[in-house]
């Protein structure tokens, strides 16, 4: 029996360069799903592109560490009203307002529906904030209330001793196709790792992009372009099929 592989491109809506990279990797490569940052500078552009490619499965990339929230979040923003990676520091200090986070999740979900004209296929998050122990239960409950699958790093959940309420997700999640050593060999190594663990469904995270002013400011910049090259390599799709995987989306779970 064929195993399900979801190659999900994160950060759709971050910028035009990111958006065009996602579309290129979907049209001419192995990307089979994406997740959108509705507070990103390229969110409107992403929505416009999605209307040209209605078959592209799009989920919600919940954001608590980038840009500005869609509503008031005094417990998380800095003096400029911006979100950032200080979320973890504030979480450790017990300074998170879960009510604010839940309300922002509702706002971003509603914004997604307004932008894309449909509900998301699933939910994940920028910088994996939904796997933070205080935040995870509310995101899981929200996804279940909406009848949506959720990205789940089961190894991380076990390490953090999260109490899972049987969320709909893949057997395995892999974030290892990332960094300065991106290659087709690395992608296939990550695939083999999941296969060895007996996963019947796997989500592989990626960030293919063309470079633009926004991407050039990112700490993770040029590897996005290398990811795009690898994900659109003519040999990769065949190699995936040879290993018994079928490309799909969270709608196939």
Curated annotation (Swiss-Prot):
Record bears the keyword Hydrolase: yes
Pathway it works in: Glycan degradation; chitin degradation
Superkingdom of the source species: Bacteria
Main location: cytoplasm
Single annotated GO MF: chitin disaccharide deacetylase activity
Catalysis performed (reactions): N,N'-diacetylchitobiose + H2O = N-acetyl-beta-D-glucosaminyl-(1->4)-D-glucosamine + acetate; diacetylchitobiose-6'-phosphate + H2O = N'-monoacetylchitobiose-6'-phosphate + acetate
Cofactor list: Mg(2+)
One annotated GO biological process: diacetylchitobiose catabolic process
GO cellular component, one term: cytoplasm
EC number: 3.5.1.105
Compartmental location: Cytoplasm
Keyword terms, alphabetized: Carbohydrate metabolism, Chitin degradation, Cytoplasm, Hydrolase, Magnesium, Metal-binding, Polysaccharide degradation
Chain sites annotated for binding Mg(2+): 61, 126
One Pfam short name: YdjC
Family the UniProt entry places it in: Belongs to the YdjC deacetylase family. ChbG subfamily.
Function according to Swiss-Prot or TrEMBL: Involved in the degradation of chitin. ChbG is essential for growth on the acetylated chitooligosaccharides chitobiose and chitotriose but is dispensable for growth on cellobiose and chitosan dimer, the deacetylated form of chitobiose. Deacetylation of chitobiose-6-P and chitotriose-6-P is necessary for both the activation of the chb promoter by the regulatory protein ChbR and the hydrolysis of phosphorylated beta-glucosides by the phospho-beta-glucosidase ChbF.
Oligomer status and interactors: Homodimer.
Protein name: Chitooligosaccharide deacetylase
The species this protein was found in: Serratia marcescens
């Amino acid at each position: 029996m064929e195993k399900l592989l979801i190659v999900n491109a994160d950060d759709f809506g971050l910028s035009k360069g990111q958006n065009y990279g996602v579309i290129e990797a979907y049209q001419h490569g192995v990307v089979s799903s994406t997740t959108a940052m509705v507070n990103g500078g390229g969110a409107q552009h992403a929505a416009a592109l999605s209307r040209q490619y209605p078959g592209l499965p799009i989920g919600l990339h919940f954001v608590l560490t980038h840009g500005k929230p869609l509503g008031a979040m005094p417990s998380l923003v800095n003096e400029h009203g911006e979100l950032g990676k200080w979320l973890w520091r504030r979480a450790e200090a017990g300074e998170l307002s879960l009510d604010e986070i839940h309300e922002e999740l509702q706002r971003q979900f509603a914004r997604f529906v307004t932008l894309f004209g449909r509900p998301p296929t699933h939910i994940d998050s920028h910088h994996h904030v939904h796997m933070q122990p205080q935040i995870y239960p509310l995101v899981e409950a929200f996804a279940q209330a909406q009848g949506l699958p959720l990205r789940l790093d089961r190894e991380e959940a076990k390490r953090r001793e999260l109490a899972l309420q049987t969320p709909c997700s893949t057997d395995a999640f892999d974030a290892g196709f990332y960094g300065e050593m991106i290659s087709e060999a690395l992608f296939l190594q990550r695939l083999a790792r999941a296969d060895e663990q007996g996963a019947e469904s796997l989500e592989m995270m990626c960030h293919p992009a063309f470079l633009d002013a926004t991407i050039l400011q990112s700490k993770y910049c040029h590897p996005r372009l290398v990811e795009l090259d690898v994900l659109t390599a003519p040999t990769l799709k065949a190699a995936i099929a040879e290993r018994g995987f079928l490309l799909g989306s969270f709608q196939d779970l």
